[in-house]
């Protein structure tokens, strides 16, 4: 929160991400979010939650998503990540807030025509995909256990918290990161690059038990030979 100083922009909003991507998919508790919400109110600020994967956070903690969202003034969540819809996100807030957001969207030209078919997919996601997120988390644990046994991989302590695995690549591995990613892709495994020698793997509906084993074997082939 910036001080009241003419050279700085005025702080109006605190934004939290749940789950937190760059921290390895860790989920924020309702108590933590409520403490931040209280701080925001004391300072006359609003609290927004980027809840792209809030249902993963809820699944990890065994609580309804609304419990994690309640302390925030506004929340967004993604339909196309863990919930596996083809596209879409949802903005949540008070009626007055949504009314203003709708007007702002119109002003910016962000409306879509005949988007009902996308909404239908989102409804299916909310009705059928939430309860199975724990399966992704379980597979992430199995994948992490398999990767931990491969020389040259340096998994973050505590990972995975939810459905994401972050791992470093030891300097003892001669290949550079892009070469490793390319070889994995040739073996049918796609991973993200989040740093010079750092990878991210995300578990989702389309990764089954066979996919977990395939990923472990692909890493062994690329890094160990």
Please place each PLM-identified region on the residue numbering:
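Conserved PLP-enzyme active-site core in the AAT-like
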Residues: 1-157, 161-187, 192-207, 215-223
């Amino acid at each position: 929160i910036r001080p009241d100083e003419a050279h700085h922009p005025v702080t109006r909003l605190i934004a939290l991400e749940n789950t937190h991507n760059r921290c390895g998919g860790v989920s924020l508790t309702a108590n933590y979010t409520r403490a931040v919400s209280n701080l925001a109110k004391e300072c006359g600020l609003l609290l927004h939650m980027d809840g792209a994967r809030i249902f993963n956070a809820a699944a990890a903690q065994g609580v309804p998503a609304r419990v994690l969202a309640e302390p925030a003034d506004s929340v967004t969540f993604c339909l196309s990540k863990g919930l596996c819809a083809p596209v879409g996100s949802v903005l949540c807030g008070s009626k007055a807030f949504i009314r203003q957001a709708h007007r702002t969207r119109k002003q910016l030209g962000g409306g879509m025509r005949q988007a009902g078919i996308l909404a239908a997919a989102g409804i299916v996601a909310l009705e059928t995909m939430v309860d199975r997120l724990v399966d992704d988390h379980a597979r992430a644990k199995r994948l992490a256990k398999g990767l931990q046994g491969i020389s040259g991989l340096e998994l973050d302590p505590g990972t995975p918290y939810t459905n994401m695995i972050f791992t470093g690549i030891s300097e003892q591995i001669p290949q550079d990161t892009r070469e490793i990613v390319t070889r994995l892709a040739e073996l049918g495994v796609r991973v993200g690059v989040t740093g010079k020698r750092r990878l991210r793997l995300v578990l989702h509906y389309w990764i089954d038990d066979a996919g977990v084993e395939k990923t472990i074997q692909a890493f062994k082939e690329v890094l160990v030979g």
